[in-house]
Amino acid sequence: MSNNTYQHVSNESRYVKFDPTDTNFPPEITDVQAAIAAISPAGVNGVPDASSTTKGILFIPTEQEVIDGTNNTKAVTPATLATRLSYPNATETVYGLTRYSTNDEAIAGVNNESSITPAKFTVALNNAFETRVSTESSNGVIKISSLPQALAGADDTTAMTPLKTQQLAIKLIAQIAPSETTATESDQGVVQLATVAQVRQGTLREGYAISPYTFMNSSSTEEYKGVIKLGTQSEVNSNNASVAVTGATLNGRGSTTSMRGVVKLTTTAGSQSGGDASSALAWNADVIQQRGGQIIYGTLRIEDTFTIANGGANITGTVRMTGGYIQGNRIVTQNEIDRTIPVGAIMMWAADSLPSDAWRFCHGGTVSASDCPLYASRIGTRYGGNPSNPGLPDMRGLFVRGSGRGSHLTNPNVNGNDQFGKPRLGVGCTGGYVGEVQIQQMSYHKHAGGFGEHDDLGAFGNTRRSNFVGTRKGLDWDNRSYFTNDGYEIDPESQRNSKYTLNRPELIGNETRPWNISLNYIIKVKE
């Protein structure tokens, strides 16, 4: 301040100049009264203690105070909170903090979040002994019977010890058998329990009794008399030697092919009630009855003639026959059919559809070896394909000739040259291997041609060279050799007569062939 408040400011002064420089007051505070008014109540009265409803100051607790968790006036820091969280509440599976149960909690026995001390356990145990009494319907504590109570036999709230039980038994035995005389069939007395061996011996009579244990173990055998159990049907069927057979279980043990048993006689062959295995044929049974509807299981062997007078025979299985006749016609087997028309045979077929699935058109392609195994083994890949899918021959547009060169072609009479030095008709002629296709050809032959001198203007062509022999042979070597035409007519039909016509109608074409008719070739691929 720039003035002397001690000597010059009166007690009544309200506004004295104030400089806020280097203070925490804002710059607009410029007099003392404003500065005093700006001081907060905490600056005048001090900062209050913090609570759940009042802002203020508070202490930071120690780690132990945080772990105890009972102080409500101090603030937890992150560090002490982390320490507390490292000690979780104890459970049945986690180690941690716990509190002690009160007496009421120990007695109630329902709290599962607090531990019980030995003192609290004693309180709970004493309470159980005082309040939890054993009855016929609930577990609990019970007192030992006194001797008078045991002998009186009237108390229903105490327990008997072995000693008290023995003392009561002595009393009761004395009442029942006042003397130690042996019991007989006519007099009361004491008895001794017989052993199993004594019961089986069967000689003891007076003074002995049979207990349930001895009775149940004195089983009947082939050597000893005794008790025996009636067997179930399953036990009787399994040949159990320790049970007795009743009329019902005897009747229920029907005879089978694997088990002896009772049987019922029948005069009718075939299925009976209970199955064929439970019935037996009587002496007068129809082994093969003539009433119809019979089923014969197994093999039927007929040594002589089998005659069906009326109707027919419906056979759904396999009939294995080595020969015979049906209505005068011989029975043919599958093997005989294959020998007649074997797989791989080719025949002409006058239709565009196959006779059966056993045949294929000879139009190329393949078949499946798994579907046609005999074809695959016999023909193989001769006509293409592969072992899994062998090929079919393609015979469309082809004639067939014998394979190889036979005796007709190797005969000397058709081989070599004739008396004029010309090759005979068998020279060079041969068939191919099976499945080989030969292209069309024309045998070598000659034509008489017109003569021409040294000229390059032949109407149907001529050779390029001109050193061919002419009419004067050795003296004429400068001639060309002229070609004839292909056999086609030269003049139009309208201008020709018999003199100017070369050939018969429709004789000339692209092929050299005889008269023919086209049919389908088919091949057998399976039986």
From Swiss-Prot:
Family: Belongs to the tevenvirinae short tail fiber protein family.
The keyword Lipoprotein belongs to this UniProt entry's keyword annotation: no
The species this protein was found in: Enterobacteria phage T4 (Bacteriophage T4)
Swiss-Prot/TrEMBL keywords: Host-virus interaction, Late protein, Viral attachment to host cell, Viral attachment to host entry receptor, Viral tail fiber protein, Viral tail protein, Virion, Virus entry into host cell
Annotated GO biological process: entry receptor-mediated virion attachment to host cell; symbiont entry into host cell
InterPro entries: Phage_T4_Gp12, Phage_tail_collar_dom, Phage_tail_collar_dom_sf, Short_tail_fibre_C, Short_tail_fibre_C_sf
Gene3D superfamilies reported in the protein's UniProt record: heat- and protease-stable fragment of the bacteriophage t4 short fibre, domain 1, heat- and protease-stable fragment of the bacteriophage t4 short fibre, domain 2, Phage tail collar domain, receptor-binding domain of the bacteriophage t4 short tail fibre, domain 2
Domain of life: Viruses
Function in brief: Structural component of the short tail fiber. Adhesion protein that binds irreversibly to the lipopolysaccharides component (LPS) on the cell surface of Escherichia coli B strains during virus attachment. After at least three long tail fibers have bound, short tail fibers extend and bind irreversibly to the core region of the host cell LPS.
One term of GO molecular function: metal ion binding
A cellular component annotation (GO) from this entry: virus tail, baseplate
Protein name: Short tail fiber protein gp12
A Pfam family that the UniProt record links to this protein: Collar
Compartments reported by the entry: Virion
SUPFAM superfamilies: Phage fibre proteins, Receptor-binding domain of short tail fibre protein gp12
Subunit details: Homotrimer.
Protein encoded by which gene: 12
Keyword Disulfide bond (UniProt): no
Main subcellular localisation: virion
